[in-house]
Amino acid sequence: MTSQLIKKIVTGDEIRNAFLKFYSEKLHKIIPSASLIPDDPTVMLTIAGMLPFKPVFLGLKERPSKRATSSQKCIRTNDIENVGVTARHHTFFEMLGNFSFGDYFKREAIQWAWELVTNIYQLSVENIIVSVFHEDEESAKIWRDEIGIHPDRIVKLGEEDNFWSSGKTGPCGPCSELYYDFHPEKGLQNIDLEDGDRFIEFYNLVFMQYNRDSNGKLTDLKFKNIDTGMGLERMAQILQEKQNNYETDLIFPIIQKICEIANIDYFSSDDKNKISLKIIGDHTRAVIHLISDGVAASNLGRGYILRRLIRRMVRHGRLLGITNEFLPHIATVGINLMQNNYPDLKNNNDLILNEIKIEEIRFRETLERGEKLLDELISSGQKLISGFKAFELYDTYGFPLELTVEIAEENSISVDVKGFEEEMNAQKERAKAASSNIDLTLEGSLEREIDLFNKTVFNGYDLLLSEAEIKGIFLDSTLVKQASEGQKVLIVLDQTTFYGESGGQVGDIGTIFSKDLEVLVDNVMRKKNVFLHYGTIKKGILTIGQKVKTNVSSSNRAKAAANHTATHLLQSALKSVVNESVGQKGSLVAFNKLRFDFNSSNPISKDQISKIETLVNSWIMENHALEIKNMSKSEALEKGAVAMFGEKYDDEVRVVNVPGVSMELCGGTHVKTTSELGSFKIISEEGISAGVRRIEALSGQSALDYFSDRNALVNQLSDLLKANPNQLFERVNNLQAELINKNKEIQKMKDEIAYFKYSSIKSSAEIVNSFSILVNQIDGLDGNSLQSAALNLTSHLGNKAIVILGGIPNPENRKLLFVVSLGDDPVKIGLHAGKIINEIARICSGGGGGKPNFAQAGAKDIDKLSDALDYAKNYLQKTLDSHSDK
């Protein structure tokens, strides 16, 4: 035995540490958890412990060692409706795993798994059942003959349960799973591993030994691999003897805090409240890790997943009776609970809490808008709320279906529940397709062929002109041997001076040429460290093996270099002027401008922008010489170098240092001294999503051109306003004051016209069953004036007033306006201005809405105005007559 038992392992931290220590002693290299934002473009989030090793399994990346072990944070949302409902479904979970890359195989994997669970975790043999693929006699034999498990404890299952594959083609193989039996007293006859109350699968051993081709044929892999996974939360439930994962020390402290805020007790709560508590507890862990790994709430991709999780937390908080802001308090508990194993949570504490706070406040406002939308649907007169609209309320505004149904029924309206379920199922299918599978296949000719090329050597930091050899030519993503004049091509070289788009910086442009060849290069991309040169052949024939020269446009390279250095200076200035916690969320370094996205909950003030510009320009004038060095990532971070949030870096990194000003990990091109930038100017600052701001700026010649254009504009305005530049401010102020006075005079005239028309009709009110009804047409008034006339008439007629006005503001526009205003008494007998105006406006192809005592609407068909007003009179006559009969 390689690991000696010291004490019984119980806590989540102890379980994790014991797993890693055990396999470390078996010569496995401990690999830190990768980010939840994967390098793999086929999946949105890290959904399995093996995902960071996918390039190794595909042979696209060198293995970190022959053996590896990790505790990988993961997120899955394809079964989100089961979170909190079942005992063990989660969005966020930790997967403990041990991996072999062409080293040990079934025997060692099974033996060590058994040693770990029985000797280290001290599980009783009586509580363990194992499953194997029914055709994998080798694994069954190891379990039976070498481990000594009784045959009755070995369950053979089919391909659906115990044969792992990533897709229709690619690496695959049988697996063996370990189950914990909570009720061994029930015996071993007729075991049903699908019985979730009795069994829980906690350790899966995948034996990756085959490759499946497009015909379904299995062939042995050259190197056989092991991929295992043990759910930390499930093992905690077992060892801590809890009813479910949520009551373990990994999650329950968060739930206790929720109970404290909601002033309820978990164990005496009903099932409905427990589900809400579990959902908030689960989602808290997912949310803090997503934000820490660089995800910002938005309506797309990962940002939408984050937003959806936060909104579910708010909604379930409301179901628990929590009406005030509470998520930051819950998140703080989650951070404190996990920061020892994930120190990035502590480092990003302020960012996490701020992002959650902003999103919670924003969603509470959104909920109010959702309630208004539902009110509009009800007041529109529809008798059925469609499944699409009900799902929109649920998905966009967080309105649960049962609440929509309840409110609709109160207003005698039905909801298309079946249509809602169809929309829900369609979304689930989209989610599963996007997040359930790890694709270990390479689709597309270009994708596959790129793997055939060696890494492109980039020598463009010091050179713009150099020699190279053509290694690959693509036409329409197909690898060819040659291409000719006029064709658009994608070229792979052995080495290049062209910078490939990365780190926000655009790719270089220029030419690839020889004596009889000229290719205009208009973009360069990087894919798997292979540089792809996009261009058009202007002269000659391009062939594999051809010797050429690469010539980068020096003017455009200089512009990009200046903007990239300016971006570094901008980030340092933001940290200095706004907040040290400001971090990059994205960037664009183009030839003509730069764009920088960063986290900030508030807009940057004009005063702050001025200070940022002044600071950057002072650094430019100080003529700092840049220092660029390669060093280990750990050394760079120790020296204080700034790394982009969520970005992946190699062990050796390139550090760009502006002494005393900025130090960042960066692979981009830069100027030699800051004075080469010339000048710096911010041209815009705006919010692009919740908690994320964007600055666009110029440097060098682009900044000078901007100043020149602005100066020309000032001169044009001076000529137009007949004032010299120094008097423009005063001149515009005077013009604005004159305009305000003129508008007041115009409004006064409109009010006089409205009063005249109001006075001419106020005596025409009719008395019906003691109510004063006035239905009339008033043309030539805008919306405000018509509203004012209606309110004045209502005030004049008193509590029993019913005023309905319609009119044409401007005959040329051919639009109608309607206003309905009611006194207190008509409202008391059930009249509703919003419902009345909808019926009237519909006659004229319009619509509107409002409150019980006041509403307004617009319409298009002016020829039906008289019909609409006649309808209003008849409707009121019938309604009031029927009321008098009661």
Swiss-Prot record:
It is an enzyme of class 6 (ligase). Keywords: Aminoacyl-tRNA synthetase, ATP-binding, Cytoplasm, Ligase, Metal-binding, Nucleotide-binding, Protein biosynthesis, RNA-binding, tRNA-binding, Zinc. It is found in: Cytoplasm. InterPro entries: aa-tRNA-synth_II/BPL/LPL, Ala-tRNA-lgiase_IIc, Ala-tRNA-ligase_IIc_anticod-bd, Ala-tRNA-synth_IIc_core, Ala-tRNA-synth_IIc_N, Ala-tRNA_ligase, Ala_tRNA_ligase_euk/bac, DHHA1_dom. The keyword Ligase applies. Its cofactor is Zn(2+). Its EC number is 6.1.1.7. Binds 1 zinc ion per subunit. SUPFAM superfamilies: Class II aaRS and biotin synthetases, Putative anticodon-binding domain of alanyl-tRNA synthetase (AlaRS), ThrRS/AlaRS common domain, Translation proteins. GO terms for molecular function: alanine-tRNA ligase activity; aminoacyl-tRNA deacylase activity; ATP binding; tRNA binding; zinc ion binding. It comes from the Bacteria. Signal peptide: none annotated. GO terms for cellular component: cytosol. GO terms for biological process: alanyl-tRNA aminoacylation. Consists of three domains; the N-terminal catalytic domain, the editing domain and the C-terminal C-Ala domain. The editing domain removes incorrectly charged amino acids, while the C-Ala domain, along with tRNA(Ala), serves as a bridge to cooperatively bring together the editing and aminoacylation centers thus stimulating deacylation of misacylated tRNAs. Catalyzes the attachment of alanine to tRNA(Ala) in a two-step reaction: alanine is first activated by ATP to form Ala-AMP and then transferred to the acceptor end of tRNA(Ala). Also edits incorrectly charged Ser-tRNA(Ala) and Gly-tRNA(Ala) via its editing domain. NCBIfam families: alaS. Belongs to the class-II aminoacyl-tRNA synthetase family. This is Alanine--tRNA ligase.
